[in-house]
A protein has these predicted regions:
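A donor-sugar binding/catalytic signature common to diverse glycosyltransferases
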Residues: 72-117
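Histidine-anchored nucleotide/phosphate-binding helix
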Residues: 3, 16-33
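Short loop/turn segments at strand-loop or loop-helix junctions that form parts
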Residues: 2-10, 43-44, 108
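Short, solvent-exposed loop/turn segments at secondary-structure junctions
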Residues: 10-12, 49-50
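Short secondary-structure boundary/capping segments
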Residues: 17-21, 55-58, 101-103, 118-123
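Short acidic-hydrophobic, aromatic-tinged amphipathic segments that line or gate anion-handling sites
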Residues: 66-72, 124-127
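Leloir-type glycosyltransferase catalytic cores
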Residues: 14, 115-139
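Catalytic donor nucleotide-activated moiety binding site of glycosyltransferases and closely related
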Residues: 27-70
Length: 139
């Protein structure tokens, strides 16, 4: 399980009305949907560098199945080994689609609402379905 952290001042998070409660809700659903799986919370590179704060801290690692990861592994390598990807609005969700995942999305990023994601809050204005190739081409 891969849960993606984002920085607190990320424009995509702010546009999705993301806050501490939404990130906590996302982690809760990841635990509920996959109760026996290990959850890796991938910190943002700028959080790791000490430049911008993220939403998740060690306090969110409430069991031995949840851990923060701020290492150098490629996001592609992390996704390859993940059974699911959770994000609010990170572009990692788009990359997850390209990698063959159907990410769980809790915000309103450009890639949500086209039938390629599990949307916690469906995007009502998007009424048609796209393939991953169509979404990639549009972007």
């Amino acid at each position: 399980m891969l849960v993606i952290d984002q920085t607190r001042d990320d424009a995509a998070v702010l546009a999705s009305k993301g806050d501490d409660a939404l990130f906590s809700e996302m982690l809760y659903y990841a635990q509920e949907n996959h109760p026996n799986q290990r959850i890796i919370i991938k910190t943002h590179p700028e959080t790791r560098a000490g430049k911008r704060a993220g939403y998740f801290t060690a306090a969110h690692c409430t069991t031995d199945k949840i851990s923060l990861y701020s290492g150098d592994a490629s996001i592609w390598d992390l996704m390859e080994n993940a059974i699911a990807v959770y994000t609010v609005s990170s572009t990692v969700g788009f990359e997850a689609i390209i990698a063959g995942h159907r990410p769980h999305v809790f915000g309103n990023p450009f890639y949500a609402g086209w039938g390629l994601t599990h949307d916690a809050f469906p995007v009502q204005r998007r009424q048609r379905r796209l393939t991953a190739a169509q979404l990639f081409w549009v972007q």
